[in-house]
From Swiss-Prot:
It comes from the Bacteria. Its cofactor is Mg(2+); Ni(2+). This is Multifunctional CCA protein. Its EC number is 2.7.7.72, 3.1.3.-, 3.1.4.-. The gene is cca.
Length: 413
């Protein structure tokens, strides 16, 4: 029985990156051998065990054989006869198909180290095409390693295009799409994930709502990049730069979906796109089974981002409706994520990436003065039922109007 460190830990060691988790392959052993040593079985589809002390994963060396469409369509075979090289052969990319022996020796049968040095993301074998999730993983690695200068090997991109043409990508289930998508969104540079998917044709199958934005013009006076899809990716890059969490980045990605439904005869304008986008956002979130927090923020940013941008121009009554539409008087925690997404949208324009967003400070102050108006004095004054709500609304509008009168206007940019 021999144990090898495999996969991402070996790759990250060679790149000089922090190793966050370690996975191991055990060659020449049976499940009983590990159980006798106190390892706890956790694998449902194939033999994976947790170390009794470190709780790191140890998997028996295995091979796999394609039996049907999608990532579920595999039969696995684990036995003491399976070699390390056979186990590494089933992995997706050469940079993930290396191992280290306990004496430090590097086992690299598929030239992963060479591809690391050449900054190439290359598939191990034609078996890559058997699992559509690998396209998403490839795109995610392109995002993760973009700062290091990695690119997808041309032959790997060609194989991905063939997978899309063969319909293999259509077998992806929503849970796996969301799992890879959400991980990619949280990378420091998430944009290459979508670039790679678009380049191989997978974006149109996995996220058609997003793919449709490319080629749709925008007014160049406001959007020097001139293309809705490009603006969306620029805004996404800004959301990462500003430190947005997953709900913020997801909301930014979806905020302009409504522009795909604008009749071409009114291009490059997109009147009411914020209204038309809401049902598209809701349907996409439902299809991918996105978490509630992601759904809620995406819907609100889609619906209200234009009002946030125009905050200084709104009437006091409209400003109050914005605060109420965001449900801030009950859910104050929504304010900062909403403002961050709106700032990313405003900065997601070619040449305007460092533009200030004074609307955020103003909207914080607007919420503060409006929230300071409560029902208590009106209840104490004897107001009843609807009278109370009407009085609170009147007083909040009065407070917001006073704020607008006294608040210093920002310089035009």
């Amino acid at each position: 029985m021999k144990v090898y460190l495999v996969g991402g830990a070996v790759r990250d060691q060679l790149l000089g990156r922090e190793v966050r988790e370690r996975d191991w392959v055990v060659v020449g052993a049976r499940p009983e051998d590990l159980k006798q040593r106190g390892y706890r079985p956790v694998g449902q589809d194939f033999p994976v065990f947790l170390h009794p002390e470190t709780h790191e994963e140890y998997a028996l060396a295995r091979t796999e054989r394609k039996t049907g469409r999608g990532y579920h369509g595999f039969a696995f075979h684990a036995s003491p006869e399976v070699t390390l090289e056979q186990d590494l052969a089933r992995r997706d990319l050469t940079i993930n198909a290396m191992a280290r022996a306990d004496d430090g020796t590097l086992i690299d049968p598929y030239d992963g180290r060479r591809d690391l040095e050449q900054r190439l993301l290359r598939h191990v074998s034609p078996a890559f095409a058997e699992d559509p999730v690998r396209i998403l993983r490839l795109a995610r690695f392109a995002a993760r390693f973009q700062p290091l200068g990695f690119r997808v090997a041309p032959e790997t991109l060609a194989l991905c295009r063939k997978m899309v043409a063969d319909g293999e990508v259509d077998a992806l289930v929503p849970e796996r799409v969301w799992q890879e998508l959400s991980r990619a969104l949280l990378e420091d540079t998430p944009v290459p994930f979508f670039r790679v998917l678009r380049e191989c044709g997978a974006l149109a199958r996995v996220l058609p709502e997003l793919d449709r934005l490319f080629g749709i013009p925008e007014p160049e006076a406001y959007h020097p990049e001139g293309d809705t899809g490009e603006h969306t990716l620029l805004a996404l890059a800004q959301s990462a730069r500003l430190g947005g969490d997953l709900p913020v980045r997801w909301a930014v990605l979806l905020h302009d979906l409504g522009k795909a439904t604008t009749p071409s005869q009114v291009w490059p304008r997109h009147p009411a796109h914020e209204h038309r986008g809401v049902p598209l956002v809701e349907a996409l979130c439902e299809r991918l089974r996105a978490p509630r927090e992601c759904r809620d923020l995406a819907r609100l940013v889609c619906r209200y981002h234009l009002q946030a941008h125009r905050a200084f121009e709104l009437r006091a009554s409209t400003l109050l409706k914005l605060l109420e539409g965001l449900d801030l008087f009950r859910r104050q925690a929504r304010l900062e994520p909403f403002l961050l997404a709106c700032e990313a949208d405003a900065r997601g324009r070619l040449g305007l990436e460092d533009q200030p967003y004074p609307q955020a400070r103003f909207l914080r102050e607007a919420y503060r003065v409006a929230a300071a108006v409560t029902a208590r004095p009106f209840v104490q004054a004897g107001f009843k039922g609807r009278q109370i709500a009407e009085a609170v609304t009147r007083e909040r509008i009065r407070a917001l109007a006073a704020l607008q009168r006294d608040y210093p206007r920002p310089e035009a940019h």
